[in-house]
Swiss-Prot record:
The keyword Iron does not apply. One of its GO terms (molecular function) is L-lactate dehydrogenase activity. This is Malate dehydrogenase. SUPFAM superfamilies: LDH C-terminal domain-like, NAD(P)-binding Rossmann-fold domains. Signal peptide: none annotated. It catalyses: (S)-malate + NAD(+) = oxaloacetate + NADH + H(+). It holds the Pfam family Ldh_1_N. It is an enzyme of class 1 (oxidoreductase). Keywords: NAD, Oxidoreductase, Tricarboxylic acid cycle. Catalyzes the reversible oxidation of malate to oxaloacetate.
Length: 306
């Protein structure tokens, strides 16, 4: 039996939860939000869809965090969303306070759960939650960027996206990078001779989210599908290789950073050895950059909550 809890059912949380539910592998899905009536009314919407889709999934909706109990997987989308003109990092203090509160409450009734962080800045929020809870925590990291990279190359070459392989690593955000030694087209190593410029791809991966937010008000459908794939790989122990952010020990902190890694009920091993030296060096630099920003933000956070 697989039980999945969603903490936060705003725009992104609803989309991920819907995709999870209609795929039918979760026996029970729990929906929590602080907004009165929001989980309940979302549950009604889902039930109306399930009646047509003939999917059998038990649903629980609540505004009481104590009702979230016995989950195998806890997906955290709760937090302030990114607005036009904002960096993901701008959300650190406000969302970190939410993560600390959740870290005190959720583990009590969800022993042994895998926590999947979605709230931004997603990698640092995973580190904050793990720091204050001690629980097994990953973030969805650069799985979404990975699909953006593949889809962009596929569109430029007029081929299906599933014929493009490879991963984006580093931080979900400013330090994201295409790991070019992993990228393939129709099973062969990527080459700019195909007519796709590397710098153009990197630029797209880093900037397209902000452009979507500017016009649509948020990114929804891409993350909704891409993040559900992470949940499914954990729930069904599929062992897919994905670019999610998992814990790395660096200096005096645990830092979450993305690189290709096997994802199932446990996360690992990482495929670091498959990267070329240039990609390894870029990842090392990304970890350092994220650590420095994280430490600076932690100091500010400690002043706010003390």
């Amino acid at each position: 039996m697989v039980k999945v809890a969603f903490i936060g059912v705003g725009r992104v949380g609803q989309t991920i939860a819907y995709n999870t539910i209609v795929n039918g592998y979760a026996d029970e899905v729990m929906l929590y939000d602080v907004v009165p009536e929001l989980p309940e009314k979302f549950e009604h919407e889902i039930r109306h869809a399930l009646a047509a889709l003939r999917v059998k999934t038990e649903l629980l909706s609540t505004n009481n965090i104590d009702d979230i109990s016995g989950a195998d997987i806890v997906v955290i989308t709760a937090g302030k969303p990114r607005k036009p003109g904002m960096s993901r990092r701008d959300l650190f203090i406000d969302n970190a306070k939410i993560m600390i509160d959740l870290a005190k409450k959720l583990p009590k009734k969800n022993k042994g759960a895998m926590y999947i962080m979605v709230a931004n800045p997603v990698d640092m929020m995973a580190s904050v939650f793990m720091k204050y809870s001690g629980e097994n925590t990953i973030s969805t990291g650069n799985q979404v960027e990975t699909m953006r990279m593949r889809s962009y190359i596929a569109k430029k070459l007029n081929i299906p996206a599933y014929e493009v392989g490879g991963y984006v690593g580093g931080e979900h955000g400013e330090a994201a990078m295409v790991l070019w030694s992993t990228v393939t087209v129709k099973g062969k190593p990527f080459s700019e001779s195909l007519g796709v410029n590397k710098a153009e791809v990197e630029d797209y991966v880093k900037k397209i989210a902000a452009e979507i937010i500017r016009v649509l008000g948020g990114t929804t459908w891409g993350p909704g599908a891409d993040i559900e794939e992470v949940i499914r790989s954990v729930a069904l122990n599929e062992g897919k290789v994905m670019s999610v952010a998992f814990p790395h020990k660096y200096e005096d902190e645990i830092i979450h950073i993305s690189e290709p890694v096997v994802v199932g009920r446990t996360v690992g091993p990482a495929l670091t050895s498959a990267l070329d030296e240039n990609d390894k060096a870029r990842l090392s630099q990304a970890i350092k950059e994220v650590y420095n920003v994280y430490k600076s933000n932690l100091k500010e956070l400690e002043q706010v909550i003390s």
